[in-house]
């Protein structure tokens, strides 16, 4: 019996991982206590997602456990022990605005929760592959000091910079060589750095198979977008439902690369076929799937057939927020040449618009 343990199993990446691994013959053990409702309010609860998981996946087994509870986690891991073939740890406090209000809660979940997961894996199923969803926020605000130029709809990297910096790839994107030190991370970023480094350590020191994926904007139709977190899904929600939206700083020209949850989980799968010990990968949509907020508004309007412009631009950017960030995917592609992006940004946005419209029709 091959078992996949997935934390944050009702979240965006977790639920996609449940589907993906279940389709490939794994028994799924899900761990999720819907902290999302506590972070962002009832409207962001993952209850519905959990219901649909249970109805879709026959032998899905759910544990309503807080990852800060070492004893309870250990009970689950002791029960299944070496049958556990892969652990996908996505559960987290995911918002940097929220983290600043409750730093202790944020750190206990992101850093200590991850530590607990690593340790129960080491003690019960040390040969399992361990996947950690880290974040590009581990690089702090270093990307904001790059040489950027302001264009009509977006900020862009000056092309001369490509050659000057060892951490900029050939297509003008950020690779894993960028330092995670000496920078302002946000409290959330710092707690994820602690977890990221500890995951590397369990790989390198204990020889465990650990993959660390530093996500750009992760998105897809299952995303319970909230204003503080998940910009694309929240923007789609506002446009389809004709609600106001606030852009925080940078004139709406801030750039992110977006990766669909399916393509990210497929990265985990490829890594799992030939795992490495404590390897880090930047995991985003890359340059081809990068977009600014202004460009996203245009694209969503086109796809949704709307003419929405109910947004205001606040001068106040979020502390430590990236002005421009695009992930260089070259390292992962070199290690795992079978992997590719299969769902581009336009397809992703189309799915999200359809998902929102269906919700609207059900009301």
Segments and roles (model prediction):
Residues 7, 67, 108-111, 188-189, ...:
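Short, solvent-exposed loop/helix junctions and linker helices
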Residues 142-173, 187, 193, 197-272, ...:
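NAD(P)-dependent short-chain dehydrogenase/reductase
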């Amino acid at each position: 019996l091959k078992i996949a343990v997935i934390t944050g199993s009702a979240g965006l990446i977790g639920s996609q991982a449940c589907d993906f691994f279940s389709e490939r013959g794994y028994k799924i053990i899900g761990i999720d206590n819907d902290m999302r409702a506590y972070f962002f309010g009832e409207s962001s609860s993952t209850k519905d997602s959990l219901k649909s998981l249970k109805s879709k996946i026959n032998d899905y087994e759910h544990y309503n456990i807080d990852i800060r509870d070492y004893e309870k986690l250990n009970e689950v891991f002791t029960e299944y022990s070496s049958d556990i073939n892969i652990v996908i740890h996505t559960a987290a406090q995911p918002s940097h605005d929220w983290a600043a209000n409750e730093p202790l809660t944020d750190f206990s979940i992101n850093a200590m929760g991850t530590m607990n997961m690593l340790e129960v894996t080491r003690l019960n199923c040390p040969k399992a592959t361990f996947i950690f969803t880290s974040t590009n926020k581990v690089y702090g605000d270093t990307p904001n000091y790059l040489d950027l130029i302001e264009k009509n709809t977006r900020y862009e990297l000056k092309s001369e910079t490509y050659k000057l910096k060892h951490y900029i790839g050939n297509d003008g994107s950020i690779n894993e060589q960028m330092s995670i030190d000496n920078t302002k991370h946000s409290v959330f970023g710092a707690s994820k750095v602690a977890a990221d480094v500890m995951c590397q350590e369990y790989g390198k020191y204990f020889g465990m198979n650990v993959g660390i994926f530093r996500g750009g904007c992760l998105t897809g139709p299952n995303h319970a977008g909230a204003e503080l977190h998940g910009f694309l899904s929240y923007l789609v929600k506002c446009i389809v439902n004709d609600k106001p939206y606030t852009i925080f700083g940078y004139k709406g020209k801030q750039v992110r690369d977006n990766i669909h949850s399916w393509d990210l989980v497929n990265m985990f799968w490829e890594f799992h076929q030939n795992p490495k010990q404590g390897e880090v990968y930047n995991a985003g949509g890359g340059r081809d799937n990068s977009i600014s907020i202004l460009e996203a508004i245009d694209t969503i309007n086109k796809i949704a057939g709307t003419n929405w412009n109910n947004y205001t631009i606040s001068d106040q950017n979020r502390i430590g927020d990236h002005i421009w960030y695009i992930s260089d995917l070259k390292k992962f592609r070199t290690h795992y040449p079978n992997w590719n992006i299969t769902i581009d940004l336009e397809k992703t946005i189309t799915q999200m618009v359809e998902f929102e419209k269906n919700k609207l029709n059900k009301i």
